[in-house]
């Protein structure tokens, strides 16, 4: 509902003032403010659990605020559904894309509001209007293509174009670059700036500090459900924002490297996967106590390497040698028995059982080892190991019976890492281990990785964040179109060299 009362000064498109929201036993928002100007990109920052999502859901009509006022274009609003917000010019591009994969691009653009000709959908008009929006935003996608055939970055562009089609004045973007390459990120930023030029106010949520400083004009910081500050980006430093977010100063973004790589424990030679398109002739060594990064653009087949090592993908050629003995991992169970562990890229879909408790999620990869002599599960040992995961991984939780889906992304990731450590691996492979995790929790994950390397684990990390690879690894293997284009020493390499190698075989 849009009220005609309480006009705004006109300086802001959106003014959220004194917003309060409580859930049973929890005050999620405590007198929070957010003001967004036209022609601006406004960063909304805070650790996971700071209240960002709750605030935006109150704006978008998904939650009803307990008190406070929301002014949009000078009028007080009180939306009761996302549909109402969309129809009035507020749109949200979610981190989890809301597209129907089996339908065409233009079907997804106009779902629920198809243009009609008589009793039928006007396919020609739908195509023309979709194409016109794509042309204006420099999006090169066939409106008739099936969404399921597109890349994640292309799907992201469709979501933004969809918001554009509603003539949105406020566009909320939640971690829009989490699955994009640097080239795709730059294209996305071009589109976002076009929206800004048209007078839109963009609310931009990201844990990537470099993006915030590259793109945004102002920043609002929340902490523990409270408004901390709203300031122009021009007068801030990265350290100042981090201090506002976490309530303390983080003296460094990455832990000191104390690991000393030792002898070679893993030798991979000419590894080629069976599934096409595949990795081809991949060769590298991994040393005891070494952190080896894998860099590359989306489509470079970085994930294929660790999935082939872990037995998820079948290899067609090449050898894997562990401690001088040639092995074959035909499936995940064999890989686990050989001392491999894999923290997968998609934490929500393949990493956790969101509706089950921390205990189950901690033990599932090692559950066979908890059977006693008569075949029953040893509950005492299971409880003890779950508590070990919570304590050693420094998981913030009320207890082991807590549903893991209720934890922050950083704490979920700690449980997953702890789960694999219970299998006592020698080789720990982590695919995008800090994706969607706030800056404070990232540092804790980096500390855990550094501690494991110091204890002699061989660690392989895939990351799309260049500062992360340069900050925590010893060497970086660069992939390009399924081929190794180089292996560089982290101490002496540069971001430009890595990007050059990543483009070598395109």
Swiss-Prot record:
<keyword id="KW-0547">Nucleotide-binding</keyword>
<keyword id="KW-1278">Translocase</keyword>
<dbReference type="InterPro" id="IPR017871">
    <property type="entry name" value="ABC_transporter-like_CS"/>
</dbReference>
<comment type="function">
    <text>Part of the ABC transporter complex MglABC involved in galactose/methyl galactoside import. Responsible for energy coupling to the transport system.</text>
</comment>
<protein>
    <recommendedName>
        <fullName>Galactose/methyl galactoside import ATP-binding protein MglA</fullName>
        <ecNumber>7.5.2.11</ecNumber>
    </recommendedName>
</protein>
<comment type="similarity">
    <text>Belongs to the ABC transporter superfamily. Galactose/methyl galactoside importer (TC 3.A.1.2.3) family.</text>
</comment>
<dbReference type="InterPro" id="IPR003593">
    <property type="entry name" value="AAA+_ATPase"/>
</dbReference>
<dbReference type="GO" id="GO:0016887">
    <property type="term" value="F:ATP hydrolysis activity"/>
</dbReference>
<feature type="domain" description="ABC transporter 2">
    <location>
        <begin position="264"/>
        <end position="506"/>
    </location>
</feature>
<dbReference type="InterPro" id="IPR050107">
    <property type="entry name" value="ABC_carbohydrate_import_ATPase"/>
</dbReference>
<dbReference type="InterPro" id="IPR003439">
    <property type="entry name" value="ABC_transporter-like_ATP-bd"/>
</dbReference>
<keyword id="KW-0762">Sugar transport</keyword>
<keyword id="KW-0997">Cell inner membrane</keyword>
<feature type="binding site">
    <location>
        <begin position="46"/>
        <end position="53"/>
    </location>
    <ligand>
        <name>ATP</name>
    </ligand>
</feature>
<keyword id="KW-0677">Repeat</keyword>
<keyword id="KW-0472">Membrane</keyword>
<comment type="subunit">
    <text>The complex is composed of one ATP-binding protein (MglA), two transmembrane proteins (MglC) and a solute-binding protein (MglB).</text>
</comment>
<dbReference type="GO" id="GO:0005524">
    <property type="term" value="F:ATP binding"/>
</dbReference>
<dbReference type="Pfam" id="PF00005">
    <property type="entry name" value="ABC_tran"/>
</dbReference>
<keyword id="KW-0067">ATP-binding</keyword>
<dbReference type="GO" id="GO:0005886">
    <property type="term" value="C:plasma membrane"/>
</dbReference>
<keyword id="KW-0813">Transport</keyword>
<keyword id="KW-1003">Cell membrane</keyword>
<dbReference type="InterPro" id="IPR027417">
    <property type="entry name" value="P-loop_NTPase"/>
</dbReference>
<feature type="domain" description="ABC transporter 1">
    <location>
        <begin position="14"/>
        <end position="249"/>
    </location>
</feature>
């Amino acid at each position: 509902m849009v009220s005609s009362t309480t006009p705004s000064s006109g300086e802001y498109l959106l003014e959220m003032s004194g917003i309060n929201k409580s859930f049973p036993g929890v005050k999620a928002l405590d007198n929070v403010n957010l003001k967004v100007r036209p022609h601006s990109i406004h960063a909304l920052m805070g650790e996971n659990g700071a209240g960002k999502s709750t605030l935006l859901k109150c704006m978008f009509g998904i939650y009803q605020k307990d008190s406070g006022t929301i002014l949009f274009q000078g009028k007080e609003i009180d939306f009761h559904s996302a549909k109402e917000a969309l129809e009035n010019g507020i749109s949200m591009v979610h981190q989890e894309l809301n597209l129907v994969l089996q339908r065409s691009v233009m079907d997804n653009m106009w779902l629920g509001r198809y243009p009609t000709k008589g009793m039928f959908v006007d396919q020609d008009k739908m195509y023309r209007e979709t194409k016109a929006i794509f042309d204006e935003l420099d999006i090169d996608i066939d409106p008739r293509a099936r969404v399921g055939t597109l890349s994640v970055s292309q799907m992201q562009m469709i979501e933004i174009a969809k918001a554009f089609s509603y003539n949105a004045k406020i566009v909320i973007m939640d971690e829009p670059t989490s699955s994009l390459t640097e080239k795709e990120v730059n294209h996305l930023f071009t589109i976002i700036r076009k929206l800004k030029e048209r007078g839109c106010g963009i609310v931009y949520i990201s844990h990537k500090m470099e993006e915030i400083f590259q793109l945004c004009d102002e920043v609002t910081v929340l902490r523990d459900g409270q408004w901390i500050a709203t300031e122009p980006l021009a007068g801030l430093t990265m350290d100042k924002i981090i201090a506002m977010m976490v309530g303390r100063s983080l003296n460094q973004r990455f832990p000191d490297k104390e690991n000393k790589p030792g002898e070679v424990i893993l030798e991979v030679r000419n590894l080629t996967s069976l599934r096409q398109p595949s990795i081809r002739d991949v060769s590298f060594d991994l040393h005891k106590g070494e952190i080896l990064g894998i860099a590359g653009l989306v489509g470079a087949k970085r994930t294929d390497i660790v999935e082939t090592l872990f037995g998820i993908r079948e290899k067609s050629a090449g050898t894997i040698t562990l401690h001088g003995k040639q092995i074959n991992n035909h499936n995940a169970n064999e890989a686990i028995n050989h001392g491999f562990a894999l923290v997968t890229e998609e934490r929500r879909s393949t990493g956790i059982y969101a509706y089950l408790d921390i205990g189950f999620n901690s033990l599932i990869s090692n559950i066979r080892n908890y059977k006693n002599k008569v075949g029953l599960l040893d509950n005492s040992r299971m409880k003890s190991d779950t508590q070990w995961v919570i304590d050693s991984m420094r998981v913030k939780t009320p207890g082991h019976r807590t549903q893991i889906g209720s934890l922050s992304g950083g704490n979920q990731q700690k449980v997953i890492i702890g789960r694999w450590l219970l299998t006592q691996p020698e080789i720990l492979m982590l695919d995008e281990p800090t994706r969607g995790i706030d800056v404070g929790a990232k540092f804790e994950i980096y500390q855990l990785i550094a501690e494991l390397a110091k204890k002699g684990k061989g660690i392989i990390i895939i990351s799309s964040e260049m500062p992360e690879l340069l900050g925590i690894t010893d060497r970086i293997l660069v992939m390009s179109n399924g081929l190794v284009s180089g292996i560089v020493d982290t101490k002496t390499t540069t971001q430009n060299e890595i990007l050059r190698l990543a483009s070598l075989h395109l």
